[in-house]
């Protein structure tokens, strides 16, 4: 068996090869091959496939290669196109033409084919990528937005410059004193000091400690007359003068209109003042300037509450203040 020479061209195929013969009107009739002489029985027509097939007979191996050679590539098969006449999107619309050349030798055939895919009507549009348009539009927007931001920043800078140009009114006072910082009723905080040209005396800067008050002042001693202090105020106070509680209560009061029973400060004095103290300590207390009128207490003698307060006053203050005038 091993020394026998088989002639492939004259080899007769068995009837088992008949499974390629499919009797269907809608499908392609493949040839029934029983040997080389019977190969030209049924050929694939070009109208059924859509390609120009060679008219010459091929061997089974050539037909097998022909079947794979005619298959379009994936990029050609799935090239979409637009049917303008019907208005439908056809993903399989292509026109192909095949130029085949047959080289026959020992029952083998080689086919070289060219497949031409017709350009779709929207090929120019396909070459035009939408990403490029979006990139250009984005650049235009960035340029436009950047220009608007620049204009806004310029406007803000202009408004700031205008606000800086508006200077607050200044008032200067010249006072002959040995004290550099004079008391004016307001509370100040020193935030800087600067040397003055052609003057041995520095200039001090103060700011009002009240919230939301922008008043500033600067104090400097005149180099021409060292006894003169120049105080310059900038802006105006938007709040009243912060005064002390005791000075506010006793400013403008006299002994005739002072009522010890109705004053809350006087009751606080009775509660919080210690019982034992010297006469020197009494004169240091601001309440020592109060002069109690004895006739007033005689008029209020009928009220027990006022009598008790009067007794406490006798215990706290010396008897000198309660002597009746002749």
Curated annotation (Swiss-Prot):
Pfam families reported for this sequence: WRKY (PF03106)
This protein's GO CC annotations: nucleus
Domain of life, source organism: Eukaryota
DNA-binding interval(s): 177-242
GO molecular function ontology, one term from the record: DNA-binding transcription factor activity
Matching SUPFAM superfamilies: WRKY DNA-binding domain
GO BP terms, alphabetized: cellular response to hydrogen peroxide; defense response to bacterium; defense response to fungus; defense response to virus; positive regulation of response to salt stress; response to abscisic acid
Subunit text: Interacts with VQ9 (via N-terminus).
Name of the protein in its database record: WRKY transcription factor 8
Organism the protein comes from: Arabidopsis thaliana
Lineage summary: Eukaryota, Viridiplantae, Streptophyta, Embryophyta, Tracheophyta
């Amino acid at each position: 068996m091993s020394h026998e020479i088989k002639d492939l061209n004259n080899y007769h195929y068995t009837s088992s090869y008949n499974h390629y013969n499919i009797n269907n009107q809608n499908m392609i009739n493949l040839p029934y091959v029983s040997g080389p002489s019977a190969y030209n029985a049924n050929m694939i027509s070009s109208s059924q496939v859509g390609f120009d097939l060679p008219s010459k007979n091929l061997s089974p191996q050539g037909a097998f290669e022909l079947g794979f050679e005619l298959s379009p590539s994936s990029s050609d098969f799935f090239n979409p196109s637009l049917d303008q006449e019907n208005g439908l999107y056809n993903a399989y619309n292509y026109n192909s033409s095949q130029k085949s050349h047959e080289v026959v030798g020992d029952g083998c055939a080689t086919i070289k084919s060219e497949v031409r895919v017709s350009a779709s009507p929207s090929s120019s549009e396909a070459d035009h990528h939408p990403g490029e348009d979006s990139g250009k539009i984005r650049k235009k927007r960035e340029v436009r937005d950047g220009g608007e931001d620049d204009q806004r920043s310029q406007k803000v800078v202009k408004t700031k410059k205008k606000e800086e140009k508006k200077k607050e009114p200044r008032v200067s006072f010249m006072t002959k004193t040995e004290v550099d910082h004079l008391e004016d009723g307001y509370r100040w905080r020193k935030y800087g000091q600067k040397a003055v040209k052609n003057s041995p005396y520095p200039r001090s800067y103060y700011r009002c400690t009240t919230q939301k008050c922008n008043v500033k002042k600067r104090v400097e001693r005149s180099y021409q007359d060292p006894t003169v202090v120049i105080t310059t105020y900038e802006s105006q106070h938007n709040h009243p003068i912060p005064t002390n509680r005791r000075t506010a209560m006793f400013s403008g009061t006299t002994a005739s209109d002072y009522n010890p029973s109705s004053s809350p400060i006087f009751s606080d004095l009775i509660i919080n003042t210690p019982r034992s103290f010297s006469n020197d300590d009494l004169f240091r207390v601001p309440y020592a300037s109060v002069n109690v009128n004895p006739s007033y207490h005689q008029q209020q003698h009928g009220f027990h509450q006022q009598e008790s307060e009067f007794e406490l006053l006798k215990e706290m203050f010396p008897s000198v203040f309660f002597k009746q005038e002749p």
